[in-house]
Every structure is written in structure tokens, then in C-alpha cells.
């Protein structure tokens, strides 16, 4: 069983050193606080905003006759989803491109598959042939490069932070 949502958020932020890649969106639906959590380089922001956020905004008190968890999982039909009840499972899915919906007061969470696709296929570097090892090259844009790293290393211990050096 999951803990309270605020405790889960604090624990997750502490374990990931509050990196900016993991997005926490807080919303209120039918008077209940929910969190939408996703790992930005690994997910499709279009899928999240077009389908998940839009579906959640369309929920009204009239539609929520049973519990909110069941109503949300029934209304978001475009995705494969799972109901989870363990914190470790939540972290597992978060680092694999899934979006997590936590509902205040619920002991379970909804996990939706919102994996993003890389803009183009990654090809091996043409001037550096390697016999063994990874064939990826960091010649893409920033978000794609971060996504490549996070696809290979799926852990809370990988922290990526943006810093500004010098003046513009």
C-alpha cells in the first residue's frame, strides 16, 4: 500500500535530488488533490497534455459516482494503464517513461504508458567506429541526449541539473 501522496512526493524529490527532469503537476479534481508525475525526457508531453490533462479537466462531479481512482482509469482509455500499490513499482515505472497519477487519500496509483519517441533513429557515429559497447552518439539536441542516457540508466541515483556558466 502506498503512503500519503505528500509523503510520496517528498520521498521522491529527496531520492531524485529534486531534479528538473521529473515534473510534478498538482491539480484539483472534484475537490481532491491529485499529482501527475512524469520524467520529461522519457515521456511524450503531447500525450500527457492532449489526453491525460484534457481527460482530467473534463471530469465533473456528476461523472464521479464511484471512487475517483476508478473513474479516472475508466475515462483515460487511450493508454495502457496499471493500478499499483508499492513505492518501488512507482519508481520503476517513472524511470521507464510512464506517467503516474496519485490521488490524495488513495492507497493506490494509476500508471499510464506515455513513452516518448526519439525524434529520429540514433545512428552510430560515422567517424568513430567501436567494436564493442554502445553505438549511440551525443549529436542530438539536449533533450534527446538526456533521454538516451536515462533510457540506459534507470535509477533515482542519476541526477541531471541545468547550470549557467558565465554571462549571456
Predicted feature locations:
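Membrane-embedded alpha-helical signal segments
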Residues: 1-168
Amino acid at each position: 500500500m502506498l503512503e500519503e501522496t505528500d509523503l510520496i512526493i517528498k520521498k521522491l524529490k529527496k531520492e531524485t535530488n529534486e531534479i528538473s527532469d521529473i515534473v510534478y503537476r498538482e491539480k484539483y479534481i472534484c475537490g481532491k488533490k491529485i499529482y501527475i508525475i512524469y520524467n520529461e525526457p522519457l515521456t511524450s508531453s503531447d500525450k500527457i497534455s492532449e489526453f491525460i490533462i484534457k481527460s482530467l479537466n473534463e471530469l465533473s462531479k456528476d461523472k464521479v459516482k464511484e471512487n475517483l481512482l476508478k473513474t479516472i482509469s475508466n475515462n483515460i482509455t487511450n493508454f495502457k494503464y496499471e493500478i499499483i500499490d508499492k513505492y518501488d513499482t512507482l519508481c520503476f515505472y517513472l524511470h521507464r517513461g510512464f506517467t503516474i497519477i496519485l490521488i490524495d487519500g488513495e492507497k493506490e496509483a494509476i500508471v499510464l504508458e506515455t513513452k516518448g519517441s526519439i525524434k529520429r533513429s540514433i545512428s552510430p557515429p560515422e567517424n568513430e567506429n567501436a567494436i564493442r559497447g554502445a553505438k549511440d552518439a551525443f549529436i542530438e539536441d539536449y533533450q534527446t541526449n538526456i533521454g538516451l542516457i536515462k533510457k540506459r540508466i534507470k535509477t533515482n541515483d542519476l541526477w541531471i541539473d541545468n547550470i549557467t556558466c558565465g554571462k549571456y
